[in-house]
Amino acid sequence: SIDFIDHFRQPGEEFDYNWEERWIRDEGFLKIVPKAINDLFDKTDIDGSEIDHFIIPSVFPRVDQMIAKKCGIDPDKVVGNMALTVGNTGSAHSLLMLASVLERAKPGEKILVCSFGNGSDAILFETTDNIKNFKPHQTIENLIEAGVEENNYLKYLTFNDLVKWEKGMRGEQDRKTALTTLYRHND
């Protein structure tokens, strides 16, 4: 466990405070993630050359390739991060990439899924013969192609609480205890 805080939000602040990107890349991604991967390799008794698909979402260009090189993973095994089509989906991003890989994976393939954010996680999967029976109802590619692009900037600002808006009487947060509910559950 490494206490590495790359961004934070002070109580009462509307936005996160991010540290310098170069520091996050060099001290975070390029030191912490390879350590997590190599620790996993030690525990599972495999090495980077055995990885068929390497998943590591990153907003930094080429960082995925640099991590692969540090861990002995063939750079051709790095999975594209889909950033140009879906942006940065946050904590769901590595799972979105995993779903995309599982749609084309073959039996016996090793899939390394990593994430970074205030530390790092590394998980190793190996597909079985059952992967041949996996037929998704919708592929990730089809979902992206059929997606609806949101071009209403005011809606974006509202959904991300970047503008104040009137929510109406029902939208107000009630911080009082509902006395009727409290009474009903008193025994």
What positions do the PLM features span?
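Cysteine-centered iron-sulfur cluster-binding motifs in ferredoxin-type domains/subunits
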Residues: 186-187
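Active-site pocket-shaping loop/turn-to-helix segments
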Residues: 14-35, 84-92, 96, 100
